[in-house]
């Protein structure tokens, strides 16, 4: 193992391992800022068609470097190797722009762990994509992810200032973060009964019939009443866009399932994708959908304990676990139950990470 600044060991990461995508880099950046451990990542996004750093990943690197005063090499578009050596995290007011439709929500999620464990509040503005494929949409962040983070202690106020769809981008989100010294441990095993399901067709600068067809298809699959569906039209975006969002409210949790409109894909297919995912979640007894399950791993590891149930565990999540283990003395125990997977943290030091 190489030696990094401040006498700390340089963690070396193979970016081609597991699912080999951008989450490996984002998790490493988050944990490097929190723990102070430097890292080098090689073969960045090796399993993607366009490997190396894209604009979204580069923005996350530069944002993390600014917040933590890091020394960085390899921070350029297309780079497949990066070294990141953080100094001290400085909370405050920050503004970052992806410059494309690359995900603003993923950039924000990269920065959150360090800022929610800082010694002062922060205000972060990120411009880019707010509703695009292969990333959590703003609604998921605000209604599904943020409430769980707040139950761990930090205060997190999220505002959607402007929509950003692929390919125009131009969206804007603001996060107001009040940190805590240490995160509370959570046991997210039982979601309770399903109380309600709603479908929202989001439409920007596109014909209404698209939304009508999506809602009709979703209603047929999920058995939704007319009062449980609505069209949300917006002109507050730089370009056209469409998404169908299914909101599943349970006694203790809300999940959002989203599918995005795309040229060449029928409105019916878009609706089917979101509705089937929602139906699979409802049919399980899991607290978390597979996407939330991946995003719970890091905060639970930082809290030093906790567990949750998920619809299923993915290669994405298993890869994330391996990266977390490089920075923290933890491991996760995964067991299959009747119609869900149970994930629990095990660690040699259950004290957790504090500021």
From Swiss-Prot:
UniProt KW Nucleotide-binding keyword: yes
Entry's Gene Ontology cellular component terms: cytoplasm
Domain of life, source organism: Bacteria
EC number: 6.5.1.4
UniProt xrefs under InterPro entries: RNA3'-term_phos_cycl_insert, RNA3'_phos_cyclase_dom, RNA3'_phos_cyclase_dom_sf, RNA3'_term_phos_cyc, RNA3'_term_phos_cyc_type_1, RNA3'P_cycl/enolpyr_Trfase_a/b, RPTC_insert
Catalytic activity: a 3'-end 3'-phospho-ribonucleotide-RNA + ATP = a 3'-end 2',3'-cyclophospho-ribonucleotide-RNA + AMP + diphosphate
Binding site for ATP: 109, 291-295
Compartments it resides in: Cytoplasm
Active site feature: 316 (tele-amp-histidine intermediate)
GO biological process, any: RNA processing
Family: Belongs to the RNA 3'-terminal cyclase family. Type 1 subfamily.
Protein name listed in UniProt: RNA 3'-terminal phosphate cyclase
Source species of the chain: Koribacter versatilis (strain Ellin345)
């Amino acid at each position: 193992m190489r030696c990094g600044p401040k006498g700390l060991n340089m963690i070396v990461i193979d970016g081609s391992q597991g699912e080999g995508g951008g989450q490996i880099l984002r998790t490493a950046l988050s944990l490097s800022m929190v723990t102070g451990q430097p890292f080098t990542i090689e073969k960045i996004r090796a399993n993607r068609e366009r490997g190396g750093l894209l604009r979204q990943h580069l923005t996350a690197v530069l944002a993390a470097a600014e917040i933590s005063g890091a020394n960085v090499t390899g921070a350029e578009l297309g780079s497949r190797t990066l070294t990141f050596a953080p100094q001290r995290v400085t909370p405050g007011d920050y503004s970052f722009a992806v410059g494309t439709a690359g995900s603003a929500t993923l950039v924000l999620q990269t920065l959150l762990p360090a800022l929610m464990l800082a010694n002062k509040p922060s205000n972060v503005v990120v411009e880019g994509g707010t509703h695009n494929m292969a990333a959590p949409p703003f609604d998921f962040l605000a209604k599904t992810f943020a409430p769980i983070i707040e139950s761990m202690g930090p205060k997190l106020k999220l505002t959607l200032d402007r929509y950003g769809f692929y390919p125009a981008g131009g969206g804007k989100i603001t996060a107001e973060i009040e940190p805590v010294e240490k995160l509370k441990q959570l046991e997210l095993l039982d979601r309770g009964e399903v109380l309600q399901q709603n479908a929202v067709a989001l439409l920007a600068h596109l014909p209404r019939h698209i939304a009508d067809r999506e809602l009709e298809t979703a209603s047929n699959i999920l058995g939704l009443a007319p009062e449980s569906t609505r069209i949300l039209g917006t002109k507050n975006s730089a370009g056209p866009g469409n998404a169908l969002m299914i909101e599943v409210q349970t006694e203790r949790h809300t999940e959002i399932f989203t599918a995005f409109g795309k040229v060449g894909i029928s409105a019916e297919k878009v609706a089917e994708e979101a509705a089937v995912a929602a139906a699979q979640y409802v049919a399980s007894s899991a607290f978390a959908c597979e996407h939330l399950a991946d995003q719970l791993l890091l905060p639970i590891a930082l809290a030093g304990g906790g567990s949750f149930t998920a619809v299923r565990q993915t290669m994405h999540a298993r890869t994330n676990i391996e990266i977390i283990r490089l920075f923290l003395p933890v491991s996760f125990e995964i067991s299959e139950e009747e119609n869900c997977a149970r994930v629990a943290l095990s660690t040699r030091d259950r004290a957790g990470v504090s500021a």
